[in-house]
Amino acid sequence: FAKIVGFPVFYVILRLQMESLLDNINSPQDLKKVTVAQLPQLSMELREFILDTLSVKPGHLGASLGVIELSIALHYFFNTPEDLLIWDVGHQCYAHKILTGRKNNFHSLRQLNGIAGFPSREESEFDAFGTGHSSTSVSAITVMAIANRLQGKTNKHIAVIGYASIVSGMALEGLNHLVSTDLDVLIILNDNSIGIDPSVGALKEHFFELENGSKNSIFENFGFHYKGVIDGHSFDELFSAFE
């Protein structure tokens, strides 16, 4: 407090509290009721929710915090769980889990009988495949797309694969198989340049060149329709790429 003309004056600082968006979201259907203009606020709330939980629970912060906007955009734009979504590695899935009905149990993350640290098909229909470490997503989403085509289904198929995962033999085998088909599959490379160990090798250098404007893409050389590098924290760029 301060004294003015001999009288104590108390200053009370009030922070304007915005109505919580996350409190009202327990499914992608709830998410779609939010306007696009409100999505940045929801991103902030999701980050705070995850940080608050993991300040007292074990878990992996970096991978999930890096895909907050992507997680929101995927469930906002696509029709999950009918549209199949695979996260590889599974550490990226925290926001996905919170948005798909597991928010109220998220405090039990990685505890006995609690929320799994990775996607789990036994846990939720939104977890299309049980991914852990790592590199299985491309092959899995390919065979799911083949199976759905044989059944006459027209749903979408999306795999989000990390920077360190896509350089593995299994992921490259999956890309080699997928490009030989005409399946409607979307592969999203989360190139955050982060792995357990420092990234090394030819693909590391190639991804760096792509980020700096190189037009010679390994993915186009494979035969994929390659959208290019986008800002994964920009809803405008994400929705444009999905279109």
Where are these regions (language model features)?
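Short, positively charged and aromatic/hydrophobic N-terminal segments
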Residues: 3-14
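Structured loops at beta-to-helix junctions and adjacent beta-edge loops in soluble globular domains
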Residues: 11, 88-90, 190
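Intrinsically disordered, low-complexity boundary segments flanking structured domains
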Residues: 12, 74, 213-216
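N-terminal amphipathic, basic-rich helices that act as targeting or association modules
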Residues: 18-98, 231-239
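Glycine-rich, flexible loop/turn motifs
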Residues: 18-21, 27-30, 57, 61, ...
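Gly-rich Lys/Arg/Thr-decorated short loops/hinges at beta-loop-alpha junctions or inter-strand turns
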Residues: 20-27, 49-53, 116-128, 215-224
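Cofactor-binding active-site loop characterized by glycine-rich and histidine/acidic residues
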Residues: 42, 60-181
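Glycine-rich ThDP/TPP pyrophosphate-binding loop and its adjacent helix/strand module
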Residues: 127-243
